[in-house]
Amino acid sequence: MSLRCGDAARTLGPRVFGRYFCSPVRPLSSLPDKKKELLQNGPDLQDFVSGDLADRSTWDEYKGNLKRQKGERLRLPPWLKTEIPMGKNYNKLKNTLRNLNLHTVCEEARCPNIGECWGGGEYATATATIMLMGDTCTRGCRFCSVKTARNPPPLDASEPYNTAKAIAEWGLDYVVLTSVDRDDMPDGGAEHIAKTVSYLKERNPKILVECLTPDFRGDLKAIEKVALSGLDVYAHNVETVPELQSKVRDPRANFDQSLRVLKHAKKVQPDVISKTSIMLGLGENDEQVYATMKALREADVDCLTLGQYMQPTRRHLKVEEYITPEKFKYWEKVGNELGFHYTASGPLVRSSYKAGEFFLKNLVAKRKTKDL
């Protein structure tokens, strides 16, 4: 398993998922006393840092191209540059992770949200994103730099238990469980994910769990396993507008199949919060984005995130356009008008961006008490 900065979903640049933990997490009882103490004492909200975007005063002065011309590679605009998180709290967290022999994609992928998504405070919660089932995917989407293979290594049967134990001891408020695609398995790994959720809830009933799942090849029974596992948020990313699906995603994935995943999760578990994400800057137009958002809302999707596509390596799809912060604000307004309960839209937003923040946490609570 691997720990990912909140989401870091699949569009992080320059790398995507990164590697899983260098070694599996051992049961707490077998850890040395020093590591036991580290697990029991932190990190907590006060250990987390918050980061800001680069100086906004330079945005209006930027004269570079935002749309790619043939043969051109776009320069990174100032609003996609962030300050390097520093200070004693950041260093304390980093040292804690090192002492526990845990490695985060937050660092490996140089995630732009490492400060903000790890941020606590009055209106945010400490959020971590765990990647299950290894670091090798059976699919090859053109935006994603995770390594691929037809037959990845077998699953670690102890991973659900070990993951749940480590997270429960760590004291997080909100955890996102995601995974690679495992088309080599009969159920796509659904049982593995469901077990992890169940173990987590057994150890900490108050923790909020979001699952960012594969499409399980459209297998409804696999979707049901995860939807009925006790999770709070069921997330599955459509990634882009329908017109660009074949260009962007693996041939085994498509918009209609992803929409069926989200619909079926709500059908079998009406109280679950459903969530999806769209990358912008791949060549889509405004009409296509609006139609996609409308279709998602008509499918009763509750939460939507929109973020800037960032090219992971030169082998992957080029960025066709850098979307301005003002345009992202516009799409957030559109999302609210369409009736999404939560719309996060911004250049650095990723699919699990600030997943446990105040609003979404309270949305889960309201849904549980039937107020919404």
UniProtKB/Swiss-Prot annotation:
One of its GO terms (cellular component) is mitochondrion. Its main location: mitochondrion. Binds 2 [4Fe-4S] clusters per subunit. One cluster is coordinated with 3 cysteines and an exchangeable S-adenosyl-L-methionine. Residues 1-27 form a transit peptide. It catalyses: [[Fe-S] cluster scaffold protein carrying a second [4Fe-4S](2+) cluster] + N(6)-octanoyl-L-lysyl-[protein] + 2 oxidized [2Fe-2S]-[ferredoxin] + 2 S-adenosyl-L-methionine + 4 H(+) = [[Fe-S] cluster scaffold protein] + N(6)-[(R)-dihydrolipoyl]-L-lysyl-[protein] + 4 Fe(3+) + 2 hydrogen sulfide + 2 5'-deoxyadenosine + 2 L-methionine + 2 reduced [2Fe-2S]-[ferredoxin]. InterPro entries: Aldolase_TIM, Elp3/MiaA/NifB-like_rSAM, LIAS_N, Lipoyl_synth, rSAM. The keyword Iron applies. Its EC number is 2.8.1.8. Pathway: Protein modification; protein lipoylation via endogenous pathway; protein N(6)-(lipoyl)lysine from octanoyl-[acyl-carrier-protein]: step 2/2. Belongs to the radical SAM superfamily. Lipoyl synthase family. It is linked to Hyperglycinemia, lactic acidosis, and seizures: An enzymatic defect resulting in an autosomal recessive disorder of mitochondrial metabolism. It is characterized by early-onset lactic acidosis, severe encephalomyopathy, and a pyruvate oxidation defect. Affected individuals have neonatal-onset epilepsy, poor growth, psychomotor retardation, muscular hypotonia, lactic acidosis, and elevated glycine concentration in plasma and urine. This is Lipoyl synthase, mitochondrial. It comes from Homo sapiens (Human).
